[in-house]
Amino acid sequence: MTVNLTLQHASEIIGQDNVDLTLAAGASAKVSNLTVASEWLTNNTGYLVTISVNDKSGNVLSSKRAGLSVEDDWTVFPRYGIVAGSPTDQNSILVKNLEAYRKELELMKSMNINSYFFYDAYNEATDPFPEGVDSFVQKWNTWSHTQVDTKAVKELVDQVHKSGAVAMLYNMISADSNPKNPALPLAALAYNFYDSFGKKGEPMTYTIGDNPTQVYYDPANPDWQKYIAGVMKSAMDRMGFDGWQGDTIGDNRVTDYEHRNSTDEADSHMMSDSYASFINAMKDLIGEKYYITINDVNGGNDDKLAKARQDVVYNELWTNGGSVIPGRMQVAYGDLKARIDMVRNKTGKSLIVGAYMEEPGIDYTVPGGKATNGAGKDALAGKPLQADATLLVDATVAAAGGYHMSIAALANANAALNVLQSAYYPTQYLSVAKDTIRKLYNYQQFITAYENLLRGEGVTNSTQAVSTKNASGEILSKDALGVTGDQVWTFAKSGKGFSTVQMINMMGINAGWHNEEGYADNKTPDAQENLTVRLSLAGKTAQEAAKIADQVYVTSPDDWATSSMKKAQASLETDENGQPVLVISVPKLTLWNMLYIKEDTTATPVEPVTNQAGKKVDNTVTSEASSETAKSENTTVNKGSEAPTDTKPSVEAPKLDETTKPAPSVDELVNSAAVPVAIAVSETAHDKKDDNSVSNTDQGTVASDSITTPASEAASTAASTVSSEVSESVTVSSEPSETENSSEASTSESATPTTTAISESHAVVEPVASLTESESQASTSLVSETTSTIVSVAPSEVSESTSEEVILMDYQKTSIVGIDSL
């Protein structure tokens, strides 16, 4: 048998390595010398890593894929996660729960999270971590009296750093948790110009019931700026945080103390008017080494923030906010895309979106709780979060060029990992099913592997006409804005030398993203097959169009593809103006597909890459090829308004106070010129498929940690080093388990190579395929510390000629970080 590693960028094979093995029946082996060489990698680039096990005839016995991001700047492609208090212990962050947090962080690491903000981990807004205090109870938190152990926070920050990620300290940018005894004089506070956060002329105050919880300063006040800068710098220094995730309560028209009773609007200003100056003041006062961003609730202040030196852009979006699309609120998937587009156009950055699906409503003043919406009924009935409700928002935001912040580590005894459903992060009523975590894992790999296609530099909305039809010729793409349901929402984007077509399935469902009615508002669309996408190639010559038609691929994070990029059938027609039209056959659509159209018609082939052993590896796979790359179905080569409408909706517990130092240097993390991939391989018998395809129950995987690779521009290629981490062993059984039907696990390593320019390689040409169910790669996300896959051969079930041709994984017998507790 052969164990193969393929590194791919888009449709290009960048590099390959393989190891040949001979195993006797019942034997096992560990492969530890597969490598990803640093010269294969370039900075701020996403790759797909495929590891497969093939028999001696080239048939794929097992395979897995993972996204790899090589980056020296996490802000280019932010993948934001949350650490917050445990609902099991009064929303507290405690030392006794560290092990649970560690498991969640390992799983999030495997999902390529490169930045975390620690939510409500502070003592008070004006004194986040009192010096010399090992543990404190949040006095302002009257509903749960949360306790925070500073040792627990510090250890979790350290773990985040060890994973190569950054840790942000959450805090409000202008709040004081002591309304009756604020830290600064009353002259520094912001005063309501209208009745809003209290009465006109009174200090702007957030109240829960009759209890004032926070009072707010004017962010433009220089005394406040100096005070909070000193407080935050001290807290971040002591606890090891890398930056500040600033929060706002929403926009409001305010005055200073002197003009608090004025009725002249000229004496007032919007709080958002001072966001940019506040951020810039923090950069000057705290220092450029600390990252900072603020939550512009519901967006809309892009012009004001355009000159702000914030490192990433973060918007918490609500359905009560006005859409970028005129005359609407931001209630539909298309409204999310419109906001992401606006931020990209104004700032050039990829928007981090906080958008909470379902948001169960439960009135706990009633004994046992009373549901106030459908999602609340689901929670009281013990139902889990709808997977597709989450995935459709993930898909929409990623396809638009943003990142949906949704995954949280909460040390929740009822969930191995949490998906945010409400604005107060420790309170997530709906459990998260194991299969939902698996699908989320696959989406995170996809978003990482194809980050340059989704939100790379120069990627913009395309002006080329695009449409989708079903097999009967009915147009399914009815609304390009994405605000109408029961359609295949189809839009095109373009980048340097390529185009993509994003397909979001809303057939049979509405376009609302919030889904507060839960299962009563089903978010699982009707799966589609045999679709035809037509993309205008207006302006291309016939010769250019013909070449482009031979460079069309389809991929998806869903189970039928799990990130594999497949050559698509494509032909050419002409429109009424005689312009070429690309006609693409799409075999299947579950939730989200991406078509990749390579438009560079002038590139010339380069020498094939050379593997570690010095053997030539052909990186062009023909449709007749029988190599492991061709055989593997998973292979790729690679305004705020006058009244405070832009405020957060009220929540059961207030979302009061939320918040990366550069990742460890290359010198600290690396010590060799290539990424070793350790794999333990063995074999288990199953019925061999005559058609060489591998069904769901036939598929095995090679498991390892997620691959997020910070890179250093300063280090030379010769000195570049990489360390590889992989997690606990994957065990194997010859007896099928109920989880074998989802058999695509994660391939991931932690690697740190230097920036290296990479020459283009040949395009992958896979067999033009109509994808079958046997290619479905539903799998359990596996996180491993030692990338080992044990494959055992059963002598009584395997003939001498086939003993090296089969593999089977039993995930229920797998000891995997973050999965055992599912």
UniProtKB/Swiss-Prot annotation:
Residues 693-705, 771-788 have a biased composition (Polar residues). Residues 1-38 form the signal peptide. Its EC number is 3.2.1.11. InterPro entries: Glyco_hydro_66, Glyco_hydro_b, Glycoside_hydrolase_SF, Ig-like_fold. Residues 619-636, 706-761 have a biased composition (Low complexity). Residues 607-669, 683-788 are annotated as: Disordered. Disulfide bonds: none annotated. One of its GO terms (molecular function) is dextranase activity. It comes from the Bacteria. Keywords: Glycosidase, Hydrolase, Signal. It catalyses: Endohydrolysis of (1->6)-alpha-D-glucosidic linkages in dextran. Belongs to the glycosyl hydrolase 66 family. This is Dextranase.
